[in-house]
Amino acid sequence: MPCPGRLLLERIDPIVDPGEVSGHVHTVSGGSGFGFNTTFEQQRDSACSSCPIKQDMSAYWTPKLYWMSEDGNSFEDVPQAGEGEGVTGGMTVYYQQRGPDPSNLTAFPEGFRMLAGDPHQRNDTGLEAAPGKAVSYVCLDYSGATSHPETGNMPDYNCPNGLRAQLYFPSCWNGVDLDSEDHRSHMAYPIGEYNNGRCPDSHPVQLISIFYEVIYQTNLFADRWWSDGQQPFVFSQGDRTGYGFHADFVNGWDVDVLQKAVDECTNDSGRLEDCPVFGELFTNDECQACRLPQSVDEELTGNLTSLPGCNPPTDGPEYATAQSCNTPEISSPTQYFTNMIQSVGWEYQGCASDDIASRTLTGGFTWSDDMTVQHCIDYCKGEGFILAGLEYANQCYCGNDYANQDAAPNPDILGNCWQPCAGNDQEVCGGSAALSVYKSCDGGACSNAVFHVNGTESTSSSSGDSSSSEKRKRHIHKHAHGHAKFH
């Protein structure tokens, strides 16, 4: 299952640190019900997912990778495959029928969650597990000019098309516990091989197997290697080796649908479309529009002087120990709109989708290299329209209704509106095929569409408070630049 979009980049881990800021940064894909406190019910209630299967609102996450200067005083986030201006990079989640009897596999039960790997591991355990052989790396060269074997750690050579990190989860369940104190003990790897084989008697229930792949664009740093030949990368928990790669999973499936797919979708093509159980899928644009705003006020991307949190880089082979320091609080999520209620009596409706072949707002149109939210509202108001939509930084569309109601803003979907306005880079003016929409209150009640994240503070929908505005200013620029198998 290719998850083309990223739901969230945040110091968040509701399995290990529920209700708290996590120790290190994670990249999250999956259902929008995700938050600092995440339950199965909240995941199932997700309005969208950055992954394509509509019956799957699970959450999948892994640590963020950074480039590190040789003197250890500078860090930069490494983009994932597919990442670019206004577009987030995702991951691939494989669902595989493995084991001695693939016809007798069980879907993840409601409320199930697990963790694989150990963020503090810094050497090779040699185990058929994670940490161990279930964690691996592939140096990508699509030209075929170079060929390297899989490694258990991050290699000390450049990969022409990036580095792929891989993790295989345990597939044997004790049949009782949906989680455990260490979030691992309720699960076990098969006997003999981490990705196949019979389950031990202690964990007799063979579940469907899942396997994560994340491609990091390490090739973008090919000319910034360390002078001694060492690779210059570090995971967000301070892991310079790669042995500490880890991953989390919170089930958000319609369990009956997953079980039906496990039983019936045996086509070896790996194409989701070849599994009729799933029916209609989310499009790539819908996956990209499914995002969550940051709720911890700290910089996670760009040029950093240290890794977020207390994560000094370590090379091992000693087991790393967790560090503690001052941690910012969870606050209200960053909001990506300008409060126009007091000034002109227009409310923010949300982020609508748009299509060049079938416009969402079909009234007036103007564009300007000095475009701002105020500029667009003034134009549409002057032309007699009650809706003003900003797109692609410098465009303004007007209307009195949405030509396509399916494209109208959904208050539960944040959307792909991240682009700084051409005339004021502290404001958001939509995005690619995405409209930041404002509506005239016409003297009536006014209320901005404020986006909420599970486990965060609420924010007044009409105040547009200054703290949210300041956070938006600090974070807006990072957003602007910035194989499923059932066999």
What is each stretch, according to the model?
Residues 1-23, 27-167, 174-342:
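Primary mode marks residue(s) on the alpha4-beta5-alpha5 output face of response regulator receiver
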Residues 14-15, 111, 171, 360, ...:
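Residue-level preference for alpha-helix termini and adjacent loops
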Residues 137, 458-461:
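Serine/threonine-rich, low-complexity intrinsically disordered segments
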Residues 168-170, 349:
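A short, local hydrophobic-aromatic micro-motif
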Residues 463-469:
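N-terminal, immediately post-signal peptide pro-regions of secreted/luminal proteins
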Residues 323-459, 470-487:
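Peripheral, non-catalytic regulatory segments
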